């Protein structure tokens, strides 16, 4: 079995593949203070619930935007799986030209998503990943990664509002019944939700005009399903895009 791990700033997503099939996947909180042993305890319990033991894991591939957590995961793999993981970063074979001024600056998750999306759809794409930050990445019809945009995530935007406007109550980020709200809670929700929908549509439309292209727009990430249905620009939602990208990169790099 192949263990794939995507370490994000807020959450870490873990997947277990049997061949090409994603058999299990879990989402846990990313904690920079956790040691490799602590992550191993969490993973052991998740595997136990699935009826899987560490000795069934044949290989591991990891993408991470959190260096301390990457070190902990690498320690976990060496100690409990018995091998060092493949790590998405400089030197890994992506099969995708990175047309960025400095390719080393591109987040591992952005490249993984781009690889997975192009492998599946084989056409020009914009990949929108709703995470701690929301990223917009353009891949042309030749499968070349051009770059994109990074915006504050929806939850970061909400937290900033609540932190700076002390009289406003903290509310759940959700789709409100109306844009013209009749109470403070719904007013906040309307501003956050529809404001973010407008941000997504606005950036995608500008990318289309700038590239003079009509790419397929694919959304992924924790909040993709919340936002995508209300936008006018997102065509597909693929919640496991990053995990699938890790599987593809593993196949391109294994000995």
Curated annotation (Swiss-Prot):
Pathway in which this enzyme or protein is active: Cofactor biosynthesis; coenzyme A biosynthesis; CoA from (R)-pantothenate: step 1/5
UniProt catalytic activity: (R)-pantothenate + ATP = (R)-4'-phosphopantothenate + ADP + H(+)
InterPro entries noted in UniProt: ATPase_NBD, Type_III_PanK
Gene Ontology CC annotations of this record: cytoplasm
Record: residues binding ATP: 6-13, 132
Binding locations of substrate: 100, 107-110, 184
Record carries keyword Phosphoprotein: no
GO molecular function: ATP binding; metal ion binding; pantothenate kinase activity
Family recorded in the similarity comment: Belongs to the type III pantothenate kinase family.
Protein name: Type III pantothenate kinase
Source organism of this protein record: Syntrophotalea carbinolica (strain DSM 2380 / NBRC 103641 / GraBd1) (Pelobacter carbinolicus)
Gene that encodes it: coaX
């Amino acid at each position: 079995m192949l263990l794939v791990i995507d370490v994000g700033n807020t959450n870490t997503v873990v997947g277990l593949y049997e061949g090409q099939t994603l058999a299990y996947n879990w989402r846990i909180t990313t904690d920079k203070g956790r040691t490799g042993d602590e992550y191993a305890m969490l993973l052991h319990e998740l595997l136990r619930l699935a009826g899987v033991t560490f000795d069934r894991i044949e290989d591991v591939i990891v993408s991470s935007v959190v260096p301390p957590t990457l070190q902990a995961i690498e320690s976990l793999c060496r100690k409990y799986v018995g091998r060092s993981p493949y790590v998405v970063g400089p030197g890994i074979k992506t099969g995708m030209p990175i047309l960025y001024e400095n390719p080393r600056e591109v987040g591992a998750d952005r490249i993984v998503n781009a690889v997975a999306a192009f492998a599946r759809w084989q056409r020009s794409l914009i990949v929108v990943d709703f995470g701690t930050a929301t990223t917009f990445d353009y891949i042309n019809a030749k499968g070349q990664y051009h770059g994109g945009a990074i915006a504050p995530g929806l939850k970061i935007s909400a937290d900033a509002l609540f932190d700076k406007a002390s009289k406003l109550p903290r509310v759940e980020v959700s789709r409100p019944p109306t844009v013209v709200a009749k109470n403070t809670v719904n007013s906040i929700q309307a501003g956050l939700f529809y404001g973010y929908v407008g941000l997504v549509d606005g950036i995608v439309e500008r990318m289309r005009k700038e590239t003079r292209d009509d790419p397929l727009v694919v959304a992924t990430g924790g909040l993709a399903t919340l936002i995508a249905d209300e936008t006018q620009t997102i065509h597909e939602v693929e919640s496991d895009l990053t995990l699938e990208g890790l599987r593809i990169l593993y196949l391109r790099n294994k000995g």
